[in-house]
Amino acid sequence: NIKGQNRGLLMARQNAFNAGSLVQVSEGGLSEINNVLIRLRELGVQAASDNIGDEERSFLDQEVQQLVSEADRIAKTTRFGSKKLLDGSGEELEFHVGPFGDDDNIIRYKMNADATASKLGIDGVSVAEKGDARSLLGTVDEALVELGKMRADFGAVQSRLNTTTSNLDIQYENLSAAYSRIRDADIAKESADLASAQVLQQAAVSVMAQANQTPAQALRLLS
C-alpha cells in the first residue's frame, strides 16, 4: 500500500530528525567542555609563570577547581529525554529510520562518549604550584585530543543521519508522485466507466421508447 508506506516514511524521517537532535545536544555539551579545557589551559600558562605570586596563583586555582567541577557536571547531566549522553553509560540506541521492520531500517549507535572529569584526567589538576600548572598543560592537551575523538564520532553519526533524512525525503517525494498518478488514473477510469454506463443507459431507454411506439403505430394504421 503506497499510502501506508508513505506515512511510514514520514514517521521514519521524524525519527531521523529526532536522532539528529540527540547528536546535536551531545555535541553542544562537548563544545562547552571544550571551552572549559581551553580556559584551563590559559590558566595553566598564566600560573606557570613567575609574573604572579603564590596568592594570585591560589586565586587562579580556585577558578580551575570550579571549571573542572562544571565540566564534570555538564558531562553527567547532558541528556536527551531520559538518556544520558556524555557520562560513558554505553547504552546502545536504535533509530528506526525506514518504513519497514527489518534491520536495514535501523541505525544503531552505542553511547560510549565519556567526557567526565575522571575520564578526561582533569579531576585532580591544580595550578596552586608552578610545577602543577605546567603538568596541567599536558593533561589538558591529552583531554582535548580525547574530546576531539568524541566530537568526530558524533560528527560522523550526524553526517549519516543527514544522508538518511535526505534519502527519506527523496523516497517520500517519489512515492507521493506515484500515488498521485495512480489516483489520477483511477479517477479517469471511474469517469470513463461512468460515461460508458450513462451511454448504455441512454441506449436502453431509447430502445424501450421505440418498442413502446411500435404497437401504437400499428393501431393507428388499423383504425
Regions inferred by a protein language model and the residue ranges of each:
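Primary detection of the long, small/polar-rich alpha-helical "axial" segments characteristic
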Residues: N1-S223
